Design a protein with these regions (language model features):
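OB-fold and OB-like single-stranded nucleic-acid-recognition modules
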Residues: 8-156
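C-terminal motif of bacterial Sec signal peptides marking the signal peptidase cleavage site
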Residues: 3-7
Length: 156
């Protein structure tokens, strides 16, 4: 059964049994994934640079978690290594990540460029534990590299 939420008020974790790929053990969340045909972060970063707001790329990419929503695990950011991050949300809020998730992940879904509203930026800053002054300093929307994941493999 899949539950769908429109905010990070409820927690649903679709967790699979751990799997070993090569020498790395992964815990799966959301849709079941394999580690075949995984795009490098360098190639995804290059793809993002050429994308417009209407473009979408369906892919799997390996990356490193930079931050996870500290309230519910309803989003995470991945480090692109170029000073930019990827905002990862989970399709239909059907699963969330552990609050203490860190390290390597493989995410599967769609990559696209979006514009994040001031309200959403403030919400994410609040979830990340930003100060009130930092939240109030957010006054304009931001071009965001976004990924809507249907499944995640978290290295454990």
């Amino acid at each position: 059964m899949i539950l769908s939420f429109t905010s990070c008020k409820q927690i649903t974790r679709q967790v699979q049994s751990p799997v070993t790929i090569g020498t790395i053990e992964y815990q799966g969340y959301g849709a079941t994934l394999d580690a075949q045909s995984v795009m490098s972060m360098i190639n995804l970063a290059a793809a993002y640079e050429s994308m417009t707001l209407s473009d979408t790329v369906y892919t799997k990419v390996e990356g490193k978690i930079k931050e996870v929503c500290s309230k519910k695990g309803c989003w995470m950011t991945l480090d692109m290594g170029s000073g930019n991050d990827i905002m990862v949300r989970f399709k239909d809020y059907s699963f969330f990540m552990p609050l203490d998730a860190e390290g390597a992940v493989i995410v599967s879904g769609k990559a696209f460029v979006s514009e994040t509203s001031v309200d959403d930026l403030k919400h994410y800053a609040e979830d990340a534990g930003a100060t009130q002054a930092a939240i109030e300093a957010i006054v304009s929307p931001k071009k965001t590299y976004t990924f809507e994941a249907v499944g995640v493999l978290l290295a454990i």
